[in-house]
A protein has these predicted regions:
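Short, conserved helix/loop micro-motifs enriched in His/Cys and acidic residues
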Residues: 249-270
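Second-shell loop/turn segments in exported
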Residues: 14, 59-63, 222-230, 262-269
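Long hydrophobic segments that form regular secondary structure
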Residues: 345-348, 356-385
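Short, solvent-exposed loop/turn segments at the edges of secondary structure
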Residues: 57, 68, 98, 143-145, ...
Length: 385
């Protein structure tokens, strides 16, 4: 349980500070009962660290001190973001009980958001008129807006269950999606996205689309495989996969975006995305078409068809086309390179193959392998009449 004191807050920071987010006002404390008195221990700034995890992605990491069984932990922070078009969902529940949680958002009048609340637990909500300064370029505009306050008190733990696809789908939470911007004297600009637009966004992303265009970083070493002597595509795929897995070990983390392949190969370890992008480049170099099939992991919630959202995507597997009419799947989180053998967390009912020239498509990964589970129950019943 003490692992809850190790907190990671992801945020964005584009190169050259073109657009960025700042985490400010961070404050964290631990409360312990000692000799009948509540003792508060505040976190010091020297345990707060920043970590770059991609060209545009950062993590703020900190550890709350003096945490043990029975400790109450508390932390708060504020996000200042240039990415007004993307506000992260706020989850009021966790897999441990929440004594109190609060979320505040102030929205200028020109921004039109779709606000969705769902979950079984009740949140106290307050909507108030607000007056604020809005920075637009070098201009400071005084405008009105709406301040939204959401509070949760004594929320129960939301435990995972083997019979539930994803407990997070039932979590009490608030989702905000920007629908459009309506400035005076300007045309209304819609921000509602389609899946085709999300395809394009990913293909242009430096930590995703650029990885699909990279040259095979193991091109010279791969000649030792003598792929030209192998008969079928399946044999080549398995040989390439085994060769790569001997170079890079999976670090047990799933991701959507990747680090530099040079860095991954140097460290000898990486996320499934780090390794999968290298695998795609190697397969393409061998003349075997391969694409990322993006998804939301089963433990992260169902990917919605009707509400396209890039925030719902969190990883991908490799979709391989050994022939024009077939697709097989691989993921670097699997130790042995068996085709169509995926861990249960990746066997989702919907994934989207990202391909150039508007050739993206939806696929289901629920039944990619011929898996059958049988349970036999024997019981002896005694009847007393």
């Amino acid at each position: 349980g003490t692992s809850y004191a190790d907190v990671i807050i992801p945020y964005y920071e584009l190169p050259n500070n073109a657009m960025k987010e700042n985490i400010i006002g961070l404050d964290a404390s631990a409360y312990n009962l000692e000799n009948g008195k509540i003792v508060r221990t505040k976190m010091k700034k020297d345990v707060v660290f920043k970590e770059r995890v991609g060209e545009s992605r950062m993590n703020l990491k900190f550890s709350i001190p003096q945490v043990k069984a029975g400790t109450l932990i508390e932390y708060e922070y504020r996000v200042e973001s240039d990415f007004f078009f993307s506000i992260d969902s706020w989850k009021a529940q966790s897999d441990i009980p929440i004594l109190y949680t609060e979320y505040n958002v102030t929205i200028p009048e020109y921004f039109k958001f779709n606000i969705e609340m769902h979950g079984a637990e009740k949140l106290e909500t307050v909507n108030e008129n607000a007056s604020l300064n809005l920075s637009i370029g070098s201009q400071l505009l005084r405008c009105s807006g709406t301040h939204l306050n959401f509070q949760g008190n004594q929320l129960p733990a939301l435990k995972d269950d083997s019979h539930v696809w994803c407990a997070d789908d039932y979590c009490t939470q608030v989702n905000l999606e920007l629908q459009g911007i309506d400035f005076p004297g300007s045309l209304y600009k819609s921000f509602t996205q389609s899946w085709e637009q999300i395809d394009e966004t990913l293909l242009k992303d430096s930590d995703f689309g650029s990885r699909l265009k990279m040259n095979n970083p193991l091109k010279e070493e791969m000649t030792a495989l003598h792929l030209e002597q192998m008969k079928g595509a399946d044999e080549k795929i398995c040989a390439i996969y085994t060769f790569l897995k001997n170079k890079v070990r999976w670090n047990e983390k799933y991701a959507l975006y990747s680090k530099s392949p040079k860095q991954v190969l140097k460290e000898g370890t990486g996320s499934n995305a780090d390794i999968n992008f290298i695998l795609i480049s190697m397969l393409k170099d061998a003349g075997i078409p391969a694409y990322p099939a993006v998804m939301s992991r089963r433990d992260m919630g169902i990917l919605p068809y009707s509400h396209p959202s890039i925030q719902k995507l969190n990883t991908f597997v490799v979709a391989i086309s050994p022939t024009d009419s077939t697709l097989v799947y691989l993921d670097s989180s699997v130790e042995n390179g068996y085709l169509n053998v995926l861990p249960p967390v990746l066997m989702t009912n919907r994934a989207r193959i990202i391909a150039p020239d508007n050739n993206s498509q939806w696929v289901s990964l629920e039944n990619v392998g011929a898996n059958l589970l049988r349970e036999l129950l024997q019981a002896h019943v005694k009847l007393f009449i």
